A protein has these predicted regions:
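A cross-family signal for N-terminal binding/gating loops and helix N-caps
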Residues: 1-131
Length: 132
């Protein structure tokens, strides 16, 4: 059986970030290089800097896209750009959208921590193609 647990979420500090549309981005796996550059220029704290930091030819084990993203995360937390919730929580959110044929839908989601299992155990199933 899956273990589903609350966790201490991290979110943008709305006292510091007043225009959320400037710091959000699509999922990392659908962002083209040109879009990543545009998002980075939108705001110095755009989330793309954490989820899709750019590799360079000079990357090393000590300085690479992942260490730069980790350093940005630490700095944003230290500077109060991001805030961590004080206690573990489950997070529920709704996504409202209209389909191409004009129907209104709300997708409700639960965000939580799940214990990892071997894929073959089929405890947690992949999220890809769940509507097919």
């Amino acid at each position: 059986m899956a273990e589903v647990l609350p966790f201490q979420g991290v979110r943008f500090n709305t006292d510091r970030i007043t225009d959320p549309e400037n710091v959000i981005a699509p999922p990392y796996d659908v962002i083209y290089q040109s879009d990543r550059i545009t998002l980075e220029k939108q705001h110095p704290n755009n989330i793309v800097r954490l989820i899709l930091s750019q590799p360079t030819d000079q990357d090393t084990d000590q300085d690479n896209q992942y260490t730069r993203a980790a350093n940005s995360l630490r700095k944003w937390l230290q500077d109060g750009i991001l805030l961590q919730d004080s206690k573990p929580c489950y997070y529920i959110y709704d996504q409202d959208f209209i389909t191409p044929d004009g129907k209104n839908y709300t997708r409700r989601a639960l965000v939580a921590v799940g214990k990892l299992h071997q894929f073959a155990d089929r405890v947690i199933l992949p999220h890809e193609k769940t509507l097919a």
